[in-house]
A protein has these predicted regions:
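Divalent metal-coordination and catalytic microenvironments
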Residues: 14-17, 36, 70, 93
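Active-site glycine- and acidic-residue-rich loops that bind
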Residues: 18, 46-50, 77-84
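Short beta-strands and strand-loop turn motifs
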Residues: 38-42, 69-74
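Catalytic-core regions of hydrolytic enzymes
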Residues: 1-9
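Amphipathic, non-transmembrane alpha-helical secondary structure
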Residues: 1, 23, 53-65, 83-91
Length: 110
């Protein structure tokens, strides 16, 4: 509701911050017809912590499985190596037969 009120953007997707949620929060999300989205913990490359591009890429490469959702952050001022890691990861994952989709796209396929 905050996004709509503040920015005029409407969504029905909810990612619990840090992956932490309560049953009450899930119940309320369901009442509001939100779909909650969790990511694959094994692929958490901690890109938000200033991790190098090579470590981000290798963490995901080693731990990736079909159907995983990878959580990456678009920027952390002065510390983000995520874009550089994606230049490594995308060609590698495509060569391994993986494909990419948005979270909204995954839900629209249900």
């Amino acid at each position: 509701l905050y996004l709509k009120d503040e920015f005029g953007v409407e969504t029905r997707l909810l990612r619990p911050p840090g992956g932490c949620f309560t049953e009450e929060a899930l119940k309320k999300a369901g009442e509001l017809e939100y779909k909650y989205v969790l990511w694959s913990w094994e692929t958490d490359a901690r890109d938000w912590a200033g991790t190098s591009a090579s470590v981000i890429a290798s963490t995901i490469e080693k731990n990736m499985h079909g159907g995983d959702v990878i959580l990456l952050h678009d920027s952390v001022v002065g510390k983000s190596h995520t874009a550089e890691a994606l230049r490594i990861l995308i060609p590698y994952l495509l060569s391994e037969g993986y494909s990419f989709d948005t979270v909204s796209g995954l839900f629209s396929e249900e």
